Swiss-Prot record:
GO molecular function: ATP binding; GTP binding; GTPase activity; translation elongation factor activity
Domain tr-type G: 63-340
Pathway listed: Protein biosynthesis; polypeptide chain elongation
NCBIfam families in UniProt: EF-G, PRK12740.1-5, small_GTP
SMART domains: EFG_C, EFG_IV
Protein name per UniProt: Elongation factor G-1, mitochondrial
Cellular location(s): Mitochondrion
Expression by tissue: Expressed in cotyledons and adult leaves at the same levels.
Protein source organism: Arabidopsis thaliana
PROSITE patterns xref list: G_TR_1, G_TR_2
UniProt-annotated binding residues for GTP: 72-79, 139-143, 193-196
Record gene name: MEFG1
């Protein structure tokens, strides 16, 4: 193995980097110090940490609290990184690997399925202490099928670590989770992982982050060696080299900067200062005046820019090889915000949903958001983020969404699937409550205010399966399992096919649904037969169409009479709502008491379009006139009038079928590029990108989901088992006339045989 010289840096290099004296700032103090052995955890240290964590957290300064998530593309090393974080902070005392080869598995992958498959399926919460800072951590899945876990984690977090693979670079799910971070305005640091891997190129990944993620970013470290020669890191802020010794990298030792790296270090530090100065006025003034920048000044500028989301500092390392994790932890507490540095808002339901800024003070009224539900051993486990006030065991709290008054029977802090009972939690905390019934997204207060938090983004399912229990005796457990899964996961839906009577489950992909079928078998002892996956098509209209329908039945006894007049039209592109109903009747042509029944009728009709029986979306219905009968009009009559009116005008609105289109990213050896690209074209895919990464080609394409079934097998065959791919939902778009005709004919044929 090649070794790098460690001769002392010459005086000219030190002068270039200005003063490196110990700073009085709290952030700078985290990384400076006149010591060689920076951190070594012993059993005594772990015991001290455990003792500290028993103290009520609300007494700690809010400045010393961090709520962070760890997100990335699948197999980038998120859970491995979290395992090291827990070890170095003394939260666990042994390191276990993700796939559980030792029979244990990573702490944060508590489900048997997670340990067997080597992937994270559910987000998991934990907490730890690092240099007097309390850190709540949520480890999230990387597979696109479990994207809701990322959504609800980021909804309640104040900061995040975006993990990037030094070989794979910025991949499709990297782009997705970064977009989610932007949606919830979450400041982040990046961690380029796996520097020990063959083909590691952190500078290429940094440039990809700038181009693909539009990050204004720069490295805060330089690696000493790469691949099998990766030995340590050079901190560009404090101009120090760090090496990671010990069987698990627990001893971080400061050393001299290798002489042959001095030029690169000077160049990269200047690049860091210049990049940050572009978004920070204080640093810009010093940079433009060519004044020396001290470590504390640079660190404070990075913190300001990171919290303002105008800069993303980039850390490096190898979690698996136990290198670079402790400096990353320093970066988390130095650069990511505390809860009181983040602007959180609620909607005042007593004041027309006016936005109210939450102070984040423990002394304010309680405001907490339920963001995740689980079925625990002792009943429903509800994860809460406390935004303001204090919640205590035994308190009575109000569910603002339902109006119910609930007692808090048990309050816990989670450590993956383990829990620690606590008496209270204050603003900024992430905790869990047992024994309260609620839905994901509900807001709780102490009753003194009527605030609700804005909801999280929940994507629509794109795939469905017909399922039924093998044994009729399992019907009760079958229903119980499906009800629980729906409560836990907003993207998992259960319905009944009105024609076949089959139970239909819908979700974000094949893996998503397979996991729930397997969980049903393991957790509820229900074996189920599963039909072929089917795509969740949609229908929509393309032009305005009028309707004028009279529903009349008067053949003795109570009659039915209701007339509705108006039009249907497509909603503008990009509308958030999928269905709109507007009553524009002037006067009392239809009594106002019947209007809700009319809206209900149109909604019911739109649940099943006449082309292929799938839901109709992007639809606006306007009611302009109508007529009623003093005796025979009823809610049922007007509901039926709306249903028939919709069916009659639907064809005139020129309906089309929409299909889910997936963003597919393939990585294949270049020798197979032509074959794979040709196959994508056969599947009616559109190639939108083609990059070269060493000996591999990375192809990006938009492909109809209906043409992607069985693709894993086909790709293995085409590439001799060397190709890999990921895909995520992009949009629903109109099918071609040819495909629409085929789908309509197939639907008509199936109806004819019933």
């Amino acid at each position: 193995m090649a070794r790098f010289p460690t001769s002392p840096a010459p005086n000219r290099l030190l002068r270039l980097f200005s003063s490196n004296k110990r700073s009085s700032s709290p952030t700078a103090a985290l990384l400076t110090g006149d010591f060689q052995l920076i951190r070594h955890f012993s059993a005594g240290t772990a015991a001290r940490v455990a003792k500290d964590e028993k103290e009520p957290w609300w007494k700690e300064s809010m400045d010393k609290l961090r709520n962070i998530g760890i997100s990335a593309h699948i197999d980038s090393g998120k859970t491995t990184l979290t395992e090291r974080v827990l070890f170095y902070t003394g939260r666990i005392h042994e390191i276990h690997e993700v796939r559980g080869r030792d029979g244990v598995g990573a702490k944060m992958d508590s489900m048997d399925l997670e340990r067997e498959k080597g992937i994270t399926i559910q987000s998991a919460a934990t907490y730890c202490t690092w240099k007097d800072y309390k850190v709540n951590i949520i480890d999230t899945p990387g597979h696109v099928d479990f994207t809701i876990e990322v959504e609800r984690a980021l909804r309640v977090l104040d900061g995040a670590i975006l993990v990037l693979c030094s070989v794979g670079g910025v991949q499709s799910q990297s782009i997705t989770v970064d977009r989610q971070m932007r949606r919830y305005e979450v400041p982040r640091v990046a961690f380029i992982n796996k520097l020990d891997r063959m083909g590691a190129d952190p500078w290429k990944v940094l440039n990809q982050a700038r181009a693909k993620l539009r990050h204004h970013s720069a490295a805060v470290q330089v690696p000493i060696g790469l691949e099998e020669n990766f030995q340590g890191l050079i901190d560009l802020i404090h101009v120090k080299a760090y090496f990671f010794h010990g069987s698990s990298g627990e001893n971080v030792v400061a050393g001299d900067i290798p002489a042959d790296m001095e030029g690169l270090v000077a160049e990269k530090r200047r690049e860091l200062i210049e990049t940050v100065s572009e978004v920070d006025d204080v640093l810009a003034e010093k940079f433009l005046n060519d004044e020396p920048v001290s470590a504390s000044e640079l660190e404070e500028a990075i913190r300001r820019a990171t919290i303002a989301q105008t800069f993303v500092p980039v850390f490096m390392g190898s979690a698996f090889k136990n290198k670079g994790v402790q400096p990353l932890l320093d970066g988390v507490v130095s650069f990511l915000p505390s809860p009181n540095e983040v602007n959180n808002y609620a909607l005042d339901q007593n004041n027309n949903e006016e936005r109210v800024t939450l102070t984040g003070s423990p002394d304010g009224p309680l405001v907490a958001l339920a963001f995740k539900l689980e079925e625990g051993r002792f009943g429903q486990l509800t994860y809460l983020r406390v935004y303001e006030g204090v919640i205590k065991k035994g308190d009575f709290i109000i569910n603002v969404n339902t109006g119910k008054r609930i007692k808090v029977p048990r309050l816990v802090r989670m450590h993956s699937n383990d829990m620690e009972d606590i008496q209270e939690a204050h603003a900024g905390q992430i905790v869990a409550v047992f024994g309260i019934e609620c839905a994901s997204g509900d807001t709780f207060t102490d009753g003194s205010v009527k605030y609700t938090m804005t909801s999280m983004n929940v994507p629509e399912p794109v795939m469905s399966l017909a399922v039924q229990p093998v044994s009729k005796d399992s019907g009760g457990q079958f229903s119980k399992a499906l009800n629980r899964f729906q409560k836990e996961d907003p993207t998992f839906r259960v319905g009944l096919d009105p024609e076949s009577g089959q139970t239909i489950i819908s979700g974000m992909g094949e893996l998503h649904l397979d996991i729930y079928v397997e969980r049903m078998r393991r957790e509820y002892k229900v074996d189920a037969t599963v039909g072929k996956p089917r795509v969740n098509f949609r229908e929509t209209i393309t032009q305005r169409a009028e309707f004028d329908y009279l529903h009349k039945k008067q053949s003795g006894g109570a009659g039915q009479y209701g007339r509705v007049t108006g039009y249907v039209e497509p909603l503008p592109p990009g509308s958030k709502e999928k269905f709109e109903f507007e009553n524009m009747i002037v006067g009392q042509a239809i009594p106002s008491g019947f209007i809700p029944a009319i809206e209900k009728g149109f909604k019911e009709a739109a649940n099943s379009g006449s082309l292929i029986g799938h839901p109709v979306e992007n639809l606006r219905i306007v009611l302009t006139d109508g007529a009623s009968h003093a005796v025979d009009s009823s809610e049922l009559a007007f509901k039926m009038a709306a249903i028939y009116a919709f069916r009659l005008c639907y064809t005139a609105a020129r309906p089309v079928i929409l299909e889910p289109v997936m963003l597919v990213e393939l990585k294949v050896p270049t020798e197979f590029q032509g074959t794979v690209a040709g196959d994508i074209n056969k599947r009616k895919g559109i190639i939108v990108g083609n990059d070269q990464e060493g000996d591999d080609s990375v192809i990006t394409a938009n492909v109809p989901l209906n043409n992607m079934f069985g693709y894993s097998t086909s790709l293995r065959s085409m590439t001799q088992g060397k190709g890999e791919f990921t895909m995520e939902y992009k949009e629903h778009s109109a099918v071609s006339n040819e495909v629409q005709a085929q789908l309509v004919n197939a639907y008509s044929a199936s109806k004819a045989t019933e």
